[in-house]
Amino acid sequence: MVVEYIRYDIDAGRAEAFEQAYRRASEALDASEHCERYEVTRCSEDPTQHIVRIEWDSEEGHLSGFRQSPEFRRFFEAVGPFVHDIAEMRHYQVTLSSEDQSRA
């Protein structure tokens, strides 16, 4: 499993449109065999900052599977207008989780 974090800087006047776009895009994520979980969050201290967190089965599943699929085209159709608002987009490996602690 790999976690993708996408940090957006969205003008206040476009925040509702951004969240609506991700609601539409979520249908494509739900349909993907590679997407395990996702969430869209807005910073409470600075509402122009949003983070999208997507758990993928693997980096390859995301980059070679999802991005080559019809689901990606539907996903990008919805969120494409916000691509220039991306401040950072990276993949991370989980090194510690509360789920790990509960199994100990």
Residue spans for each PLM region:
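An amphipathic, aromatic/His-enriched active-site/gating alpha helix that lines ligand/cofactor pockets
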Residues: 24-36, 55-90
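Residue-level signal for secondary-structure boundary sites
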Residues: 16, 60-62, 97-99
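Ampipathic, surface-exposed secondary-structure segments
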Residues: 19-49
